[in-house]
Every structure is written in structure tokens, then in C-alpha cells.
């Protein structure tokens, strides 16, 4: 096992215009303060205020958006980070682990990773993801790229169908088809930060949001040693070279994770479980009393000193006494949140310290709050009650289905851009208006400038005389469409769909 030295992980250099020379503790902290400014002032963070947490298109400001959720995760992440550092200090481990002058960056990386953790999510959350992936699957049929004979390939894009005698190109075709059918919010977050917004964050800060280590073009089973870390796609083919450099800069082995990402993940798990239950009461999906009975019944028999008794029952009893002269709902969720944090944060911090050799190596194949403990059971309780009584509610399901239809519909509306030949689309990009393509010209104008520039830059770097050029060009054209639609807010996507379907002006 390699020696634990966080100076080898908390890399304050950047991809472009990186600070040079040896830096003092204060100078390194200023570099991470610059990261904070870049992140907090970015449009991607602002757009989170109109993206779904659980309830799409919600007008009640008391119900969480992705932004308010991310701010709560940021605070919990800060709490866990401080708890870890405090315990390490008591154990006199800070200097031994190279953290004595890096406590500020340690906290900052965790906080900003938490704030950014959802920036790649499309409109309507997981249903938006499903809509994008289903739409591309119906056209690319990536599963057929594994089959023989080649005549069975149902891919609708002629250039991406497998061809006899072109094995090197066929392998690229397989990768592209698989990659485009595995849109994922975490992978899109990496693409946003590096490629689309060019935030030029420190290597350590980007490492904090690389939650999953599986490439989106992965086919087949994942290694048993990394099955948890690779359970979802973490980055796209378009960012393959950048992630390879990131691994080198952060001393990460293949498919391994950056250590501080486990803290961000735990903060998210703690935050959303309580928040989803609270938002459902705010939405009157169930009453507070009904929620308590749902939790009580799902936990089952318990002793007086059990975790359920100390956390949930304690919050229920205190809220019933109304000692603070506030609404019962407000008091219950205040106590539930405090009780939950007071139990789960120290537990997560200790799990991090106890498993530090594997976490530092990036190979710890679990979440911090995923084990056989009562703390893990408490989180499962919150999640199971939310799945059974919140996500399955008719109002929630109706809005999710509408969101799926909106994203599918927008992809269909913009499909003509993907139907153009390479030469025709190149002409459209260069001239921006081509008389013989009136529909395509107008659709192209609607694409945002940063997304169009990202496409142009990616294609301009390709050798145009290579046989791979048409494949890569089409790949980046599909990415252009996914980037544009996934970057919309819920409300903008909803309004845009209605306008383009001529439902309203």
C-alpha cells in the first residue's frame, strides 16, 4: 500500500495557464479561492435554480430546486470535511498525511464538488437522461454493433453501421454508438467544466466531481474490484484524453476515484434523503403524521435506544410538544435534520478515516454510508419511503412523463441537423444560413454560441483527410445536440417545446 500523502493528490495546477513554482500555504489557498469564484459565478450554477430536484416545474419557492439542494449538500460536505480534519488532528495524523498546510484546500475542494455535483443534469432529472438515451438508442442500436452478421445492424446512421473489412473503423463505430447512448449527468458535468465552459479549474477540483470511473463507451461486465465505482458512466469519449491527463496529475490508477469524492457522495446521500421527505409534506403529498407512520412501519420493531428512536421518534416527540411556537412541520424537519446529521456525519467521517488506505488509493469499492450499520439502514429507510410514497405519486409521475415527452420531442425537432450530410452541415456551420436548407438554418441559429463553438473547435482539431473524420464529426454533432438540450432549464425546455410544436406563440 502506497504511503498516504495528500500533497500528491491535492494538485493545485491547472490544464491551461497553470501557476508556476513552489507555493506557500496562503498562495495555494488563494488558487482554490479562485476555483470557488469561477464555480459560483458560472452560468451552470445559476441554471440549477430552474432545474428539478423531485418536483418538475414547481412554482412553490419553498420546494427545493437543484440549486437549493446543492447548497445544502455543500454545507453537509463542509461539515463532514471539518469532522474528518478535526479527528485527524486529535490523532496527530494531519502532518503524517501531508494535510497540515492543506486543510483549507481540503475543505474547499469538498464544498465546491458538492455545489457542482448536479451541474450536468438535464431538464427533468433522470427522466431527461432516459429520454436522451432512449432517443439515441432507437437510432443507433448499439447492441447490434456486437452482433453478426453485419446485415442485422439496425443502425439508422449509415456512416456508423459496421462494414466488412474495416475493423479499426468498426471499433470506433462501436465506441461512438455506445457512448452517445449513455448520456449521464455526472459525465456531462465533466464535459461542462472542461470542454463547454472552459473553467480551467485545478486538477484536484475536477477530480472531486469524477464520481464514476467507467467510460461511457464501456461494453460488457465491469471488474468486480471496481463494480461500485463503475456502476454508471463517468466521462465521454470526447473527454478521454483530458481524463487520462487528470489521472496522471492526481496519481490515480485506471478506474480509481479521487479520495475527496467519497465525502461529496456521502453529503449528497444525507441531504437528499431528508429533503425529499420534507418537500413531499410541503407539496401535501402526505401529512406529517402519515409520513411518521410510513417511517415507523417501514423500520419495524425497535428498542428505545435504537437509531430510529434517537433520530425519528425524538424529532416526532419534540415537534409535538411545540416548545418553539413554530409549525409542527417546521419543527419536525428541523429536529429530524439535526438528529440525522449528528449521527451520520461523524459516522461518515470515521468511515473515511478507517478506510483511508483504500480511499487514498481510489479503490474503496463502496459508498461511505453503504454498509451493515444502523446509519446505513436509516438512509435506506428514508430512500425507501420516498420511492414508495413520493416518487410513485400520480402528480410526480405525470410530470415526469411530460418531461420525458418534452425532451424526446425537442430531440425530434432538431433531428434534421443530424440528417444533413457532412458537406452540407459543414457548409451550414461556415455560412450559418443556407438557402436550400431553410429549416436546418433556423434550427442551427437556435443553438447556443458556446455549444456551437465547442463543436467547431473539436472538429477543427481532427485531420480532415483521415478515414475517421466523418465518424468523429458526426459524433461531435450529436454531442452538440445533447449539450444544447441537456443545458436547458426545465422551464426553458417546456416553453421551447410548446413554441416549436406551435402549441403557443
From Swiss-Prot:
Optimum pH is 8.2. Its cofactor is Mg(2+). GO terms for molecular function: dGTPase activity; magnesium ion binding. Gene3D superfamilies: Hypothetical protein af1432, putative deoxyguanosinetriphosphate triphosphohydrolase like domain. It comes from the Bacteria. CDD domains: HDc. GO terms for biological process: dGTP catabolic process. Keywords: Hydrolase, Magnesium. It is an enzyme of class 3 (hydrolase). Pfam families: HD. Inhibited by the action of reducing agents such as dithiothreitol and 2-mercaptoethanol. This is Deoxyguanosinetriphosphate triphosphohydrolase. InterPro entries: dGTP_triP_hydro_central_sf (IPR023293), dGTPase (IPR006261), dGTPase-like (IPR050135), dNTPase_1 (IPR020779), HD/PDEase_dom (IPR003607), HD_domain (IPR006674). Thermostable. Fully active at 60 degrees Celsius. Belongs to the dGTPase family. Type 1 subfamily. Residues 66-273 form the HD domain. It comes from Shigella boydii. The gene is dgt. It catalyses: dGTP + H2O = 2'-deoxyguanosine + triphosphate + H(+).
